[in-house]
Amino acid sequence: MNDWMPIAKEYDPLKAGSIDGTDEDPHDRAVWRAMLARYTPNKGVTGDPLLTLFVARLNLQTKEEKLKEVFSRYGDIRRLRLVRDLVTGFSKGYAFIEYKDERSLLKAYRDADGLVIDQHEIFVDYELERTLKGWIPRRLGGGLGGKKESGQLRFGGRDRPFRKPINLPVVKNDQFREGKRERRERSRSRERHWDSRMRDHHDRGREKRWQEREPARAWPEGDWERERDFRDDRVKGREKRDRSK
């Protein structure tokens, strides 16, 4: 596939539900729900989406001050928002950090992913809600990433990029039959040749007895031909598999 990309450039719920982005039918109800959903980004969110990072898998006890301390190492922060439950005020375990310049954003994106903060290994990605066309959040069956235990894995993002599809060669039936017919004809030709040689050998054997038996088995010519053909087929098959990888 010449247009294959590990990271989605546009959000498609059906493709996101497939490990290689090739599914043609939804495999669970959440994918169906995401395909039917219509989502409009929150207009109350401010700041430049192209300078904003999404930070997830935070310890629920991690505070804004700690995040600012860690992420200010990469550049000047314009805005930091730790998302909290509206009722309880408890952290939901993710935040958005807006930098003042792109250089700081890229440095944090590259170096902060996988950092351990308050005994939790964090995940860092670009903000997608306002930057990825067609975005559907996880609560509507979409999103990206996730864990196997959740039963809602989504592919095409930094956490779980698409795997490259495996393109198996298609053999047409008529080509298969033609090749099979040719192999049968070659096999019959070798068998006729072999029968003729065996009859000659049997006749000569009546006139002369072996004085001693050879220590090792001598392969008749027909067997050598079969063995050579077998090896050639194995080599061709291995080369074909190597080219298809």
From Swiss-Prot:
Query: What does the record note on quaternary structure?
Result: Component of the U11/U12 snRNPs that are part of the U12-type spliceosome.
Q: Where in the cell is it found?
A: Nucleus
Gene designation: SNRNP35
Q: Where is the signal peptide?
A: none
Write out the GO biological process terms.
mRNA splicing, via spliceosome
Annotated stretches, region: Disordered: 146-165, 173-222
Q: Name one GO cellular component term.
A: nucleolus
Q: Which PROSITE patterns match?
A: RRM
| Composition-biased stretches (Basic and acidic residues) | 146-162, 174-185, 192-216
Molecular function (GO) terms for this protein are: mRNA binding; snRNA binding
Its name, as the record gives it, is U11/U12 small nuclear ribonucleoprotein 35 kDa protein
Q: Where does the record place the RRM domain?
A: 51-129
Organism whose genome encodes this protein? Bos taurus
Q: Per its UniProt record, what SUPFAM superfamilies does this chain match?
A: RNA-binding domain, RBD
- Record-linked SMART domains: RRM (SM00360)
